[in-house]
Structures are given as structure tokens and as C-alpha cells.
Amino acid sequence: MKGFIHDLFLDPHFSRADIACDIVDVPDDFITQYRIVDPISFKPIYGRSGKLETAYWGSRASERQVRLYNKKLEQERKKVIVPKEIDTRWRLEMQLRSGKATDWHAMVQESLDSFASPHFLPIDIKPIDKIVIDGLIAEPSNWSIIARHTKYKYRNLLKQESQNDELTNHLRETFKESADELKKELDTWLLGLDVTEK
């Protein structure tokens, strides 16, 4: 099948890649404080309870859109049986298009470098900086009312936090463990190399 697909196209490439990771049994209140801190659009969707159910970063038409959503809630609404031992399940999903799809490995790393929360800020952070970060995360529209150099300062602080963040580092490790196998599989689809049909 892979050889057949390869023979059909002169320059085979991916125009879209969806890469997802499930986050299981991390409390909802902990997860919902995470943000992609890049200067891209942010669209949160809240349920009737007022709790975050889905968050989008980037527009649907952009080359990169990141979505964080309550996968357990989605499954329950679709009447999918969820194992009783799973308390929470969130999914972080990156949808990449055009050139970003081809450069999927770097785009995942870049997205994770911007996936931050207030949970693991440096212990020596100034109290005023912690208050501002809490305010920016609680009310993302506040980003639009602060000066450009101030935005840069707090984005940089959050990106530093991302390097110490236990959850984000776990996602990095999981991706690192899977990336080589995923790349090998994608390469065989694209290039028809080293494919043994059984």
C-alpha cells in the first residue's frame, strides 16, 4: 500500500499532521491553568458549570492550532464507556498544516516550550510578578492591555517556567520516546523507504 501511494505522487508530502497526547488523572483545576504563551489567539470554551472544557490557541485556518480539551467529558457525552479507575483525562492536540506539518518534530517541541502554568514558577519570583501572571492566566484578555515589553517579560517568565514544569517535562519525555518510531513510520509513507510488505 505504501509503495502504491508513493508511486502515485511525484513529490509526496504531508499537508496536515495531528499529534496528540493524553493527560490522565491530573486534577482538572491543575490542567485548566495551562496556557500556550505565544502571541496567538486564545479561545476558551466553558461548560454550564463555568469550568473550562476546551481551549484553542491559533485560528482554525492557521498553520498551527493547539487544542486542550476534556477527553473524558467528550467520551461520556458520546456514551463511550470510560474505565472507572480514570478520574480525569485531558488531551493536548496539535494540528499542523502545510510547512508546519512537514516540520512536525520542531513544532511539537516549540509548542511544549510555550505550554506553561503558574505551578512551577521560580521560588525567587517577585510577588508582583506572580500576581500579574496569575491575572494573565485567569483573564487572558489582560494581555491586550499591557505594554509590548511587559508582554515579552511575562511570556519569557512563563517559558522559563515551562522548562521546570513537571507535567510539560513529562510530555516532552513521552514525545521523545515516541518521536523516532513516529518519524520512521512517516518516512516510509512519504518516501517508500525500507518498507517490507508482509
Model-assigned labels for residue ranges:
Residues 151, 155:
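Helix-turn-helix DNA-binding segment
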Residues 1-150, 161-198:
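Structured, helix-rich domain cores that form ligand/interaction pockets
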